[in-house]
Amino acid sequence: MPATTAETLSLVNRSVSVAPLVLLSVVDHYNRTQANKSKSKRVVGVLLGQNDGKNVRVSNSFAVPFEEDDKDPSVWFLDHNYVESMNDMFKKVNAREKLIGWYHSGPKLRASDLDINELFKRYTPNPLLVIVDVQPKETGVPTDAYFAVDEIKDDGTTTSKTFVHTPSIIEAEEAEEIGVEHLLRDIRDVAVGTLSTRITNQMRSLQGLHHRLRDIQAYLQKVLDGQLPVNHAILGNLQDVFNLLPNLSTPKSGPGATGTNADSELNHAMSIKTNDQLMAIYLSSLIRAITAFHDLIENKIQNRQQQEENDAKKKEGENGEKKEGADKKEGSPAAANGESKEKENSPKEKKK
């Protein structure tokens, strides 16, 4: 039965969250497979979790033996008996985790994905496909989630199967978050300030936005050239995104005002705001430098005072040793005189 627009929108609006354990398992599966092969081939596995119709939680996964022909995409092999036996064993361990879909290492959709997806419909009505980019070239979420739907064409021809993209996030459970925080606590660089962290995050966000805009531009260009059919659902979503953009044009000051004069107020306001932000950054840097100089001077003064105290103690010790030596020298002649007197008296006693 062809999927209606409402059903397609319900699939697109589903919240898909992937646990970090799944990403670790997929990467480990890929590395173990590539170690025994000369060519890099994609790997396929099964996703386990919960799907309540609105939220999809992918919490676990397991690998599946899979082979395909590089020259003919329609020739592939997936051991469904292995899938059934592993699924039964996972049910005994955790009955809450059910088979909700499958994954492969992509990094893009393949021609045989629709046929593989039909195979997984034996186990779940609407399987979820998650493509995990095991070798990402850009920063961002390394997962892409898809649901298969029947696309209704405008010319009245027969429907065709296609995948619709749904947003996905990486979300860890509380125990996983505690473990990650414990590991990162020892390797986190405390010297990195909050400002640099914010700037790095904003730069990564802008890079991801630029990548998405390039994808949108390439898609619209292909639709314009006739390489792809017109999809009203995608165009409607793009129009909603464009409608959210702020109106940066200012009203004209008079009937004879030109566009340049009309936008001068906006440019002036943006310049003032930018200058204020740069002034705040400059003042904060200046205050931080002055504080560092103050701490340096305080450390110098403390080191000098401590050095003077050590020198004074050292001089006192040397003076004390000199006095003791002088006292010993003064006492030794008196003792010698006493001994000589005793020797003089001793012969007299003998004579008596």
Swiss-Prot record:
BP terms from Gene Ontology: proteasome-mediated ubiquitin-dependent protein catabolic process
GO MF annotation: an example: metallopeptidase activity
UniProt lineage: Eukaryota, Fungi, Dikarya, Ascomycota, Pezizomycotina
UniProt keyword annotations, A-Z: Proteasome
Gene assigned in the entry: rpn-8
Source organism of this protein record: Neurospora crassa (strain ATCC 24698 / 74-OR23-1A / CBS 708.71 / DSM 1257 / FGSC 987)
Stretches assigned to the MPN domain: 16-152
Gene3D superfamilies xref list: Cytidine Deaminase, domain 2 (3.40.140.10)
Superkingdom to which the source organism belongs: Eukaryota
Protein's UniProt name: 26S proteasome regulatory subunit rpn-8
GO cellular component, one term: proteasome storage granule
UniProt-annotated stretches for the region Disordered: 303-352
Biased composition (Basic and acidic residues): 306-331, 339-352
PANTHER family, per the entry: 26S PROTEASOME NON-ATPASE REGULATORY SUBUNIT 7, EUKARYOTIC TRANSLATION INITIATION FACTOR 3 SUBUNIT F-RELATED
Family the entry assigns: Belongs to the peptidase M67A family.
Function: Acts as a regulatory subunit of the 26S proteasome which is involved in the ATP-dependent degradation of ubiquitinated proteins.
